[in-house]
Every structure is written in C-alpha cells, then in structure tokens.
Amino acid sequence: MREGVNKVALCLFEHNEKAYRAAIRMMDQYGKAAIAHSTGTGKSYIAFKLIEDNPEKVVIWLSPSEYIFKTQLESLKRNDSDFPLVNVHFYTYAKLMCCTQTQLEEIAAQKPAYLILDEFHRAGAECWGESTVALLKLCQDAKLLGLTETNIRYLDKNRDMAEELLDGHIAGDMNLGEAVVRGILPAPKYVTTVYQYQKALAKYQARVDNLRTPGIQDANQKYLDALRRTLEQADGLDRVFAHHITNKSGKYIVFCANKEHMDEMVSHVPEWFTGVNPDVVVYEAYSDDPNTDKAFADFKTDISDRLKLLFCIDMLNEGVHVEGISGVILFRPTISPIIYKQQIGRALTAGDTAAPLILDVVNNFEGLTSISGLQSEMQEAVHRLYANGEGDKIVTERFEVIEQVHDCRILFERLQENLSSSWEHYFSEASIYYAEHGNLNIPKLYTTPSGLSLGVWLVT
C-alpha cells in the first residue's frame, strides 16, 4: 500500500521490475542509468515507479513533446487517478532550446533529485543537444534516468547516446525482436506489398541504361522487365486490404510521410478501403494541426461499426499508445530503423494477446526487406536465451509474414546483386587502369580491351 493513500503501489511487468531494480543500483553507484526497451513494453512506468518511490523528491521530466507526456499521464491516471505528481516538472527538449542561460538556471534552482530523459536518443539532435547538456551541468547533484527504444542514432553516424549522456550505464536492454520472442509483445501478422512503384522502376531503368557493355546490360534488362511484369500482375491495394483487414470495424493507424503525402493517401480511401467496409471514417492527426487533440480523442473513443482510420504524420511514432488498435498501415518511403520500429510498435502493446495486423506498403523495393531486421533480432534473441539456459522464456520463435509480392522481392534482389557485380567489374577495370597509368584521366569514349565502356562509366 502507498503510504497515506488507500492505493496499491504501482505493479510493474516482470521485465520492467528487473530493469527498475538494476537502474536504482546504477543510479546509486554511478548517478545515472539508461533503459533501452522496445516500444510497447511500458517503459514509462519505470519512471513513474521511481516517482512513486520518491514522493518528496523533485523530479524534472524531459520529453520530445507535450503530447507524449500527456498520453503517458492519461494511461497512468486510468490505472491510478491519485498518483502523486506534485513534485514532477515537465519540459520538452525544444523548450530547453529556447531557454536563456538564466532560465536554465531557474529550472535547475528547483534542485531536482532526479532528471528523467525520455526518448533520450532525441537529445542527440543538433538543435536540442546543447541546451540539454547545459541543464545537466547545472543539475550535477541530480541522478539521471534515461528511457529510449534504442540508444543508437542510426542516421547520425551511429552515435551512442547512452555513452554520450549516461556514460554507457545501461540497466536494461531489450529490442523489439526479443520482446516478441519472450511473449512480452504479441507476434504480429505482417503483410508486405508495394504501391506507386513507377519511380523506383524508372530509377533502376536508368541504372541499367548506363551499363555500356551489351552482355551485362541485356542480363539486367531481363531481370528488370520480369520485375515490371510481375508488379503489373500483382493485386492492387483494394484487394490486399479487403483480404487482410479482417476486423471490418477495427481501428487502424495509418502512417504517412508528410502532409502532402497524407492528403494524397486520404484521397484514395474510397478506392482502397470500400471493399473492407463501405462505411469508413477518417481521422487526421499531425503536429501543426490545432484540431489534432480532438481528432485523436474522437478516434480513441469511437466504438461504432465503421472502419476507423487515423492518418498521422510522425507525432505517433514514439511514446504514444492507443488501446484497442487492430493494426497499423505503413505508407512509407525509406525511413530510419528507429522510426520503422516505432511505427510497427504502435500495433504491439504489452499484455495484448491477439495478433495485430501490420500492413507494410512501400514505394521502393528496398523496403520489401525491412522486416528481415526484426526477424534477425528474434533469431539472435532465441539463440541467446538458449545459450544462457533460459529457453523456458521463449514464447514465440517466429511470426507470419505474408509477401504479396514475394516474386518481386526475389527478382529485385537478383537485379541488385547483378548491378552490384557489374559495378565491381567496372571498378576492377578502373583499378587496373590506375595501376598502369597512375591516374583516371580517361577519355569519355575509352573502352577496355575486354569491351567495357570505362570512360562513360567514370563520368556517370
């Protein structure tokens, strides 16, 4: 029981309880700890547990957005409306960036016992990092607890933010694959397909056209033509959705790249989704829209028989979970591994048992293999658990992946392999020329003794 309140103390999932205890030990020893747990595993409750266990201590909570913190609080209040938050002060990383030195000193003057860095990999952003580090220097007596799905900034030279901000003290580390293997998150039904692939075909046609050796060009053109024919014969999105969206009145989050992209996708709703349910309602949520709060709230409370689609841009990537989601639909270009995992993670929530649907709809062929990263994580987790004598913790070793365009992926991989070997062939000839002549000042029309148009290759 919580002291002075007729309430039972917060009860963490086993994986979070273990990480919390390790974090307490690390903070006592080093003053800082990081927890890198997959999206959907409830890691914000680790921070709430820290607050509950230290009700008299001042806590400063830093987060990428007010929206994330607000939804985390909503989830907490559903479980415990009297949770003690009087000593918790919330700021966004963006707010810190706008603070003067005096304002940062005023924040530090609250003398926090703890600083919680939520989604702390985001503090590595150039615009946010400096002010965050400045505040940490002003709060040197505070213990630091960092929460993230991954501490690596993949598109920023693989910077390790746990190392930079928390001296590499990681109290808990569990990626999405391990969370699924251990049954903490439900295994999804994963469907891949492509749409609007004409630009991608044109890009590869240009690469094939630039191959000046007839034999090599002809071989690659055959693969590309076969890929084009296979794509033309594949089911359209209307058939894919009608077949795989089995909960006809379910709630689905639809991720888009930007506002223009979202508007275009929404315009296709009648064409693509009427075969699922002719009664479709569309909600839209994006950070610059003042109506977002209402749209999001209406989506969450909608219990009608309509098919409910929440189209959104980036704001639901991290930290925000919606109960009762039947699945997610990703309309996406190539994105970072972090955002990809966060988006598919919106369909996965600890404690759920039903297999959620993930429809991965890509406009580039490279995206067809994205799921292999998660599958590799799962295989590594299975091997590690068996090796550690923890085979009893394995609940799921694999999940269903339905490739609507399986043949396309195989043809694309062969085309990629062929184009790469062609490049290596040209590179090898260029290396030979350089070794013989000491430079690559090759006339554009120069061909090698074997017939390669090396001059043209070098200028293209």
Where would I find each of the regions flagged by the language model?
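Conserved helicase ATPase core of P-loop NTP-dependent helicases/translocases
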Residues: V280-I313
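Conserved SF2 helicase motif VI
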Residues: S336-D352
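SF2 helicase catalytic motif II
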Residues: I107-G146, I152
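IQ-motif-like calmodulin-binding regions
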Residues: I402-T460
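Interdomain helical connector at the RecA1-RecA2 junction of SF1/SF2 helicase-like NTPases
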Residues: D156-Y252, V266, P270
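Walker A/P-loop
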Residues: Q29-K49
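Conserved segment of the helicase C-terminal RecA-like domain
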Residues: A347-G373
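Conserved Walker A/P-loop ATP-binding site and its immediately adjacent core
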Residues: S44-K49, D53-L76, A257-E260
